[in-house]
């Protein structure tokens, strides 16, 4: 089965072709980072318009790269939610228009399910069941993944997602957009232990997260430093230490909660998905913990940590292989800007 995947939930336009026998044939991605940088964040209307401009050229790109023809495609999967309403509508409209014109079925995919399943795109995918740490700009969750569509929420953030905390801390430090990668790069120049920040809910006894207090702690300590050194020169030199302190604190919490989830479920496989999963400090800490504790940790390829069409094509193919009745030919679609992943549980 050959499935075309279309991702347009936020500020990346992604298209891909996935074959259930041959794997990922081709994927193409356009990021809107440069367009949104001058505004310091994603502008929804601009994002929607750019998806319209980019989708069809990307389709031609993946068809050319894969050698496939439109007649070879068996179904079209698109991101149905969650995400920006306008951006979702663009992707859904394009998917259903193509499907109508080509006489193909469609299937709407949960964006986070795509992330959860994205590590299955590697050469040696992890078998079910596993614990998944889903960590991105909008979500931070620990899930038990028993099979496609069989998900149990173990813990989640009570306020800011980890990626959101990265972005907000970047703004406090006067860094550019997107903030998460900038904070991580600056942290590598910081001195370990020079700035010590709290580890929120580290010993809460559950698997939930909270990152809003960590961001506030950065702001409070920065203000104290500014007051002590009027001129700001010391503060400029200290920014790397603040970034290091923030990243160390966030990583410590993510690793500790992941270990606790593995212990609670008695599983030995951890999958890390979402944009923050590309963070080098997080990967290094989890790899060290895996070696010490005797469990396996799996990641998608770095290029597939961000939003992409490959994960949507994969999720669509896996769902249609198990539940062919989920394919739709009525082309009357809806999008779900808010959509609880737990609602997919079978």
Curated annotation (Swiss-Prot):
<dbReference type="InterPro" id="IPR017861">
    <property type="entry name" value="KAE1/TsaD"/>
</dbReference>
<dbReference type="InterPro" id="IPR000905">
    <property type="entry name" value="Gcp-like_dom"/>
</dbReference>
<dbReference type="InterPro" id="IPR022450">
    <property type="entry name" value="TsaD"/>
</dbReference>
<feature type="binding site">
    <location>
        <position position="180"/>
    </location>
    <ligand>
        <name>substrate</name>
    </ligand>
</feature>
<feature type="binding site">
    <location>
        <position position="115"/>
    </location>
    <ligand>
        <name>Fe cation</name>
    </ligand>
</feature>
<dbReference type="Pfam" id="PF00814">
    <property type="entry name" value="TsaD"/>
</dbReference>
<dbReference type="GO" id="GO:0002949">
    <property type="term" value="P:tRNA threonylcarbamoyladenosine modification"/>
</dbReference>
<feature type="binding site">
    <location>
        <begin position="134"/>
        <end position="138"/>
    </location>
    <ligand>
        <name>substrate</name>
    </ligand>
</feature>
<protein>
    <recommendedName>
        <fullName>tRNA N6-adenosine threonylcarbamoyltransferase</fullName>
        <ecNumber>2.3.1.234</ecNumber>
    </recommendedName>
</protein>
<feature type="binding site">
    <location>
        <position position="167"/>
    </location>
    <ligand>
        <name>substrate</name>
    </ligand>
</feature>
<comment type="similarity">
    <text>Belongs to the KAE1 / TsaD family.</text>
</comment>
<dbReference type="InterPro" id="IPR043129">
    <property type="entry name" value="ATPase_NBD"/>
</dbReference>
<keyword id="KW-0012">Acyltransferase</keyword>
<dbReference type="GO" id="GO:0005737">
    <property type="term" value="C:cytoplasm"/>
</dbReference>
<keyword id="KW-0808">Transferase</keyword>
<feature type="binding site">
    <location>
        <position position="279"/>
    </location>
    <ligand>
        <name>substrate</name>
    </ligand>
</feature>
<keyword id="KW-0963">Cytoplasm</keyword>
<dbReference type="GO" id="GO:0005506">
    <property type="term" value="F:iron ion binding"/>
</dbReference>
<feature type="binding site">
    <location>
        <position position="307"/>
    </location>
    <ligand>
        <name>Fe cation</name>
    </ligand>
</feature>
<comment type="function">
    <text>Required for the formation of a threonylcarbamoyl group on adenosine at position 37 (t(6)A37) in tRNAs that read codons beginning with adenine. Is involved in the transfer of the threonylcarbamoyl moiety of threonylcarbamoyl-AMP (TC-AMP) to the N6 group of A37, together with TsaE and TsaB. TsaD likely plays a direct catalytic role in this reaction.</text>
</comment>
<dbReference type="GO" id="GO:0061711">
    <property type="term" value="F:N(6)-L-threonylcarbamoyladenine synthase activity"/>
</dbReference>
<keyword id="KW-0479">Metal-binding</keyword>
<keyword id="KW-0408">Iron</keyword>
<keyword id="KW-0819">tRNA processing</keyword>
<feature type="binding site">
    <location>
        <position position="111"/>
    </location>
    <ligand>
        <name>Fe cation</name>
    </ligand>
</feature>
């Amino acid at each position: 089965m050959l499935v075309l995947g279309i991702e347009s939930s936020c500020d990346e336009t992604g298209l891909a072709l996935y074959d259930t026998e041959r794997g990922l044939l081709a994927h193409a991605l356009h990021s809107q980072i440069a367009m949104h940088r001058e505004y310091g964040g994603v502008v929804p209307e601009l994002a929607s318009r750019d998806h319209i401009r980019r989708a069809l050229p990307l389709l031609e790109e993946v068809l050319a790269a894969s050698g496939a023809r439109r007649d070879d495609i068996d179904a079209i999967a698109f991101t149905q939610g969650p995400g920006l309403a306008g951006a979702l509508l663009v992707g859904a409209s394009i998917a259903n228009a193509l499907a109508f014109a080509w006489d193909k079925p469609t299937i709407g995919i949960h964006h986070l399910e795509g992330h959860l399943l994205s590590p299955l795109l590697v050469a040696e995918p992890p078998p079910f069941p596993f614990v998944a740490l889903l960590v991105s700009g909008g979500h931070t969750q620990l899930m038990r993944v028993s099979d496609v569509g069989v998900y149990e929420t173990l813990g989640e953030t009570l306020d800011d997602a980890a990626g959101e905390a990265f972005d907000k801390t970047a703004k406090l430090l006067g860094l550019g957009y997107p903030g998460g990668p900038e904070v991580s790069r600056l942290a590598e120049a910081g001195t370990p232990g020079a700035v010590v920040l709290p580890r929120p809910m580290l010993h809460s006894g559950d698997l939930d997260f909270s990152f809003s207090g960590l961001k506030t702690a950065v702001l409070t300590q920065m203000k104290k430093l500014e007051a002590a050194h009027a001129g700001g020169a010391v503060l400029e030199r200290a920014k790397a230490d603040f970034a290091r302190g923030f990243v160390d604190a966030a990583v410590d919490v993510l690793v500790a909660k992941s270990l606790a989830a593995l212990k609670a479920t008695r599983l030995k496989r951890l999958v890390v998905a979402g944009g923050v999963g590309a963070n080098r400090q997080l990967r290094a800490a989890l790899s060290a913990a895996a070696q010490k504790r005797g469990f396996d940790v799996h990641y998608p390829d770095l290029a597939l940590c961000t939003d992409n069409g490959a994960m949507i094509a994969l999720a669509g193919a896996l769902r249609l292989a198990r539940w062919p009745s989920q394919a739709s030919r009525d082309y009357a679609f809806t999008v779900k800007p808010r959509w609880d992943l737990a609602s997919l549980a079978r």
